[in-house]
Amino acid sequence: MAVEPPLPHLVLPVRAATPSGELVRLRRLVDGEPRPDSSSEYDDWGVFDIHFEEDWHDRAMVEVSPAAGGPWVPVGDMSWHSELHGPNLGSRAISIGVSLRADARGRGIGTVAQSLLACALHRGGVHRVQASTDVANVAEQRSLERAGFVREGVARAAQVRADGRHDLVLYSCLPGEPVFVAQ
């Protein structure tokens, strides 16, 4: 049974700039469109049911362009999915994640992309936007904090990868909280 992705009519913001002036934009992935290779040490999922992956979330391409203008270059992608924290839609949160090519990391692109998506989700009526990352992924923790997310704590043994269970650091962003890019 196919499940409709969360917020299928979400309007993604046009673009925003990194501190170095690179422009970042998000655009929805087209069905079957290849994604950039953005694998990292945190992506070894082991046995994975691809049908589950395709049915439970939505995706956007992360693209960059030089500050002076030029072509948009895909450097990664983002995903988001619904999570319920209670029995009603008011208890729904949207969890987001970003994955960037190795050469795009450390440039502020992930910070801007996560902030853009959080702003779009808030404008689309989502109250709680959340993210999580491995406790060892300090770079992503800093990126989320720069994007305006608030660290909430650690979810112990919350994620399973090929080498076993991993603790995750949880973050959230609520409407009205400061974010990296203007709303």
What are these regions (language model features)?
Residues 1-104, 120-129, 136, 158, ...:
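GNAT-family acyltransferases
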